[in-house]
A protein has these predicted regions:
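Helix-to-loop junction immediately C-terminal to a conserved catalytic motif
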Residues: 51
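Conserved ABC ATPase signature
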Residues: 135-139, 143
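A short, proline-enriched helix->beta-strand linker immediately N-terminal to the Walker B motif
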Residues: 154-158
């Protein structure tokens, strides 16, 4: 597979300290490449060096076989989509205007831009007639991030850079957007470089994962190889961490009183006590409410509100341990 991005002996120094040290890395065209590791490991710095927002102190970075030093960086960035944790939609622009930003800079005709906006909104399940003229403040966090994603792919860039884009979202929105990224990648084949500190997210999304610590890549491999053959105990512990957390089920919600006694008339989708929370996330990203069934009897219902309340309580409990 062709190399799209390559780091050769790259170093980055801040205040006399190396935050990236002798980084050698090749990212292949068409893959989802995930940078993962603890806070301060150099993930975001590495990502920022790809589009020239941060310049290396030594070494060289190549994009499509050419050193970044040879590019007009502004024009090069038009060929790199970007999705951030902060969402960063322009607040005074409509959804349509936000999506059109790069195509307009590239000189696309008005009708071509309008057609592209409608095509992309439909692709992510947002009705163009309802959403194209809305302002960002009128959207939920998940809807804003969907717009952020399609804005990044609007001009069909060679690569999309994603810096912890879903970390501020609730579990249901996060799961839904992860599925969206996988679906769009399968359809479009665009190279994605994705930064996260979440092991489960890295394993779910990545074709390859680079595990970073103290500015160095400790191991770069497929998710399967990282899980089966971690290079050292530190990597093993890091990737074992998600397995050590309790896998919540519907029963945990019911026992703790986090459900509704009434059942909405339009609620048809059912779950039982043994249904894992991950499956509940997926269902609630599609249906507004789901029915809890135990021993062939409907005992209540769930919405995202009950899930958030339960998870918030558990998070507070863990912080107090």
């Amino acid at each position: 597979m062709t190399k799209l991005i390559e780091f050769k002996h790259v170093q980055k120094k801040y205040d006399g300290k190396y935050v990236i040290d002798d980084l050698n890395l090749a990212i292949k065209k068409g893959e989802i490449f995930v940078l993962v590791g603890p806070s301060g490991s150099g993930k975001t710095t590495t990502l920022k060096m790809i589009n020239g927002l941060s310049k290396p102190s030594a070494g060289d970075i190549y994009f499509k076989g050419k050193s970044l030093n040879e590019y007009n960086l502004q024009k090069m960035r038009w060929n790199m989509g970007c999705v951030l944790q902060q969402i960063a939609l322009f607040p005074t622009m409509t959804v349509k205007q936000n999506i059109e930003v790069i195509p307009e800079m590239l000189g696309w005709e008005k009708q071509k831009r309008a057609d592209r906006v409608d095509e992309l909104l439909q692709k992510v399940g947002l009705s163009p007639d309802i959403y194209r003229d809305r302002m960002p403040r009128e959207l939920s966090g998940g809807e804003q991030q969907r717009i952020g994603i399609i804005r990044a792919i609007a001009a069909s860039p060679d690569v999309i850079l994603m810096d912890e884009p879903f970390s501020a979202l609730d579990p249901i929105s996060r799961n839904s957007l992860q599925e969206l990224v996988l679906s769009l990648h399968e359809e479009l084949g665009t190279t994605i470089v994705f930064v996260t500190h979440n092991m489960e997210e890295a394993i779910k999304l990545g074709d390859r994962i680079a595990f970073m610590k103290d500015g160095e890549i400790i191991q770069c491999d497929t998710p399967e190889q990282l899980l089966m053959n971690p290079k050292n105990d530190y990597v093993r512990h890091f990737f074992d961490e998600p397995k050590q957390t309790k896998e919540w089920r519907v029963e945990d919600l019911v026992v703790n009183g986090y459900f509704l006694n009434e059942i909405p008339e339009n609620a048809r989708q059912q779950v039982c006590f043994d249904t894992p929370m991950k499956e509940v996330y997926s269902l609630l990203s599609v249906y507004p409410s789901i029915v809890i069934v135990e021993k062939q009897r409907s005992i209540g219902s769930l919405t995202s509100k009950e899930i958030f309340a339960f998870l918030s309580r558990e998070e507070e409990g863990n912080e107090n341990i």
